[in-house]
A protein has these predicted regions:
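Hydrophobic/aromatic residue at the end of a short beta strand that borders the catalytic acidic motif
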Residues: 2, 29, 215
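Alpha-helix termination/capping residues and helix-transition junctions
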Residues: 11-12, 28, 69
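Glycine-rich phosphate-binding loop of ATP-grasp-fold ATP-dependent ligases
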Residues: 27, 31-35
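Acidic, glycine-centered active-site loop in nucleotide-sugar glycosyltransferases
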Residues: 14-15, 32, 127
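PLP-dependent aminotransferase class I/II
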Residues: 5, 41-232
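Conserved PLP phosphate-binding loop immediately N-terminal to the Schiff-base lysine helix
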Residues: 1-21
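Short beta-strand-to-turn element immediately C-terminal to the catalytic PLP-Schiff-base lysine
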Residues: 20-21, 34-40, 81
Length: 232
């Protein structure tokens, strides 16, 4: 959420510690790595030590606790610093993509990722949609594969993903919840109470649309034509 604000505050300023990713698909990218934000010198010093394999201040390699090799290379850091002045420009490009989707998909039984404009200003990093329940065609997902049964006037994330892939455009489901991952399925977790599993429902009906800031209006219109055709 780099660049996004909530009630006038940058999202990275909430809490004692915040983390920012510079992965290859982020709004500012170094292809990998990230940053930790804190006003605590104690926390910052601790993390710096851990990131250099927890090496002690000695002439030899001295390790008294477990550390990690999480240092960012100078090359990656330079790439990130070189992009930072363009953050506002990237956000404007992302917002234009979001607004074109919202206008171009108007009339379909979908909802674009919402935000509370009176309180929040997103960075519009990723444009997503949620298909109305009544407009979902049958869809089944295993751990690695998915299938669907097409129905007139209805669609599902799997159908749209496959249709866009034929145009060489990548779309993906919204993130699979941690408690549904095979590694965690047999682990205990705390829920908000009985009722609908909101995360699982969003994963089932949600879709991340192509959102690269270099996406042209013409190509985006073709993507929207494909999405509209899935609901025909």
């Amino acid at each position: 959420s780099l660049g996004a604000t909530y009630e006038g505050r940058q999202t990275g300023t909430f809490g004692d510690i915040a983390a920012i990713s510079f992965n290859g698909n982020k709004i500012i990218t170094g292809s990998c790595g990230g940053a930790l934000l804190t006003n605590s010198k104690k926390a910052a010093d601790r993390v710096r030590k851990w990131s250099t394999q927890a090496r002690e201040d000695a002439a030899w390699y001295q390790h008294e606790e477990l550390g990690y090799n999480y240092r960012m290379s100078n090359v990656v850091a330079g790439v990130v610093r070189g992009q930072l002045p363009y953050l506002e420009e990237h956000m404007a490009q992302k917002r234009a993509i979001y607004e074109r989707y919202r206008e171009g998909l108007r009339g379909l039984p979908v909802t674009m990722n919402p935000y509370e404009a009176a309180k929040a200003e997103p960075n519009f990093w990723l444009s997503c949609l949620l298909i109305d329940e009544k407009a979902m065609c049958p869809q089944e997902r295993g751990d690695l594969e998915a299938r669907y049964e097409g129905q007139s006037g209805k669609s599902c994330p799997t159908e749209i993903i496959e249709a866009l892939a034929r145009y060489n455009a990548e779309a993906r489901p919204i993130w699979k919840p941690m408690h549904l991952q095979p590694f965690f399925r047999d682990k205990a977790f705390i829920s908000a109470g009985p009722g609908e599993d909101v995360g699982a429902d969003i994963f089932r009906r949600g879709l991340c649309l192509p959102s690269d800031n270099k996406l042209t209006a013409d190509r985006q219109e073709r993507i929207m034509e494909i999405v509209r055709a899935c609901f025909a």
